[in-house]
């Protein structure tokens, strides 16, 4: 391992293996997350990303490989790590019988130099339900409270599992702003999410995990950068014969159904492609409600890498 990694990496995973009932859900995974950066870990359900993060949090014991968090073993040196790491679980992991503000103040008292609780209450809009018990909170409210609890101790590293799940747009923006602030303060953020726009907006580095391994990684720009590939998105009034459009455009372009009456065309999309699509629509007396051309998105790349079948 290069010497620079020892300084820059908050998380270092090498050859991680974890099996359940003889089946490897993590199969020789390598991953690094740098300090002062947001690392997004993406993958379909069952890809192994949650198990990987749980090994980093000391919640699971690896069957093989090494995991180092802030240079320490999360299993044998958990006592030293706990004050330095914040964890936000997707299910919250919060005691349900206490009031929201009481819980956050209790967590803050566990740390030597916590954030101001009042500041977090204001930033994340916790005041409206401060005196409500956790069991009565909505999913989005629980997520905001769990995030506050994860960052109140001023961690050097924070793990965020689906941080904006169930949130309205205003709450989600507040969460994103706080994540950016943490990064700017030098905190390492490891983010798992199914929201591609969240990863595109926040991540400095993206790792795509599938079948227990990292199958692609890099910045969002690196992953979507293909000078020739563009995506045409088409939505029509009524039914759309996706197979017929694909035959008309030829094998050089990929035409994919994207819901009722819509599709995407991926490849070397240019003016001739747009002309061919509009000519085909006119020939079939089909009205386009929306036709846009743009760069490939992270979601396009993710689906190309992991497939489109349900898991």
Roles of regions detected by a PLM:
Residues 176-268:
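ABC transporter nucleotide-binding domain
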Residues 14, 235, 292-294:
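Solvent-exposed beta-strand sheet faces enriched in polar/charged residues
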Residues 86, 108, 112, 225-228, ...:
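A generic structural signal for secondary-structure junctions
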């Amino acid at each position: 391992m290069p010497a620079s990694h020892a300084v820059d990496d908050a998380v270092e995973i090498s050859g991680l293996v974890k099996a359940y009932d003889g089946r490897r859900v993590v199969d020789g995974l390598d991953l690094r997350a740098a300090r002062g950066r947001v690392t997004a870990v993406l993958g379909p359900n069952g890809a192994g990303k949650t198990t990987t993060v749980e090994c980093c949090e000391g919640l699971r014991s690896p069957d093989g490989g090494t995991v180092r968090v802030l240079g320490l073993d999360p299993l044998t040196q958990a006592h030293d790590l706990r004050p330095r790491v914040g964890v936000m679980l997707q299910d919250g992991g919060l005691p349900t019988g206490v009031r929201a503000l009481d819980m956050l103040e209790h967590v803050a008292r566990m740390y030597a130099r916590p954030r101001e609780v009042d500041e977090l209450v204001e930033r994340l809009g916790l005041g409206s339900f401060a005196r409500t018990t956790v069991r009565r909170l909505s999913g989005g409210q629980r997520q905001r409270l769990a995030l506050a609890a994860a960052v109140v101790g001023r961690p050097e590293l924070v793990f965020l599992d689906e941080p904006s799940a169930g949130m309205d747009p205003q709450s989600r923006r507040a969460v994103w702003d706080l994540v950016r602030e943490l990064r700017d303060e030098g905190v390492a953020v490891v983010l798992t999410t199914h929201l591609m726009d969240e990863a595109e907006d926040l991540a400095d580095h993206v790792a795509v995990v599938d079948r227990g391994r990292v199958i692609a990684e890099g910045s969002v720009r690196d992953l979507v950068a293909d000078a020739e590939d563009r995506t045409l998105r088409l939505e029509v009034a009524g039914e759309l014969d996706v197979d017929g459009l694909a035959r008309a455009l030829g094998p050089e372009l990929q035409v994919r159904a994207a819901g009722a009456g819509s599709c995407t065309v991926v490849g070397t999309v240019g003016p001739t492609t747009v002309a061919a699509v509009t000519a085909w629509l006119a020939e079939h007396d089909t009205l386009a409600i929306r036709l846009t051309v743009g760069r490939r998105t992270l979601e396009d790349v993710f689906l190309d890498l992991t497939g489109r079948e349900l898991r």
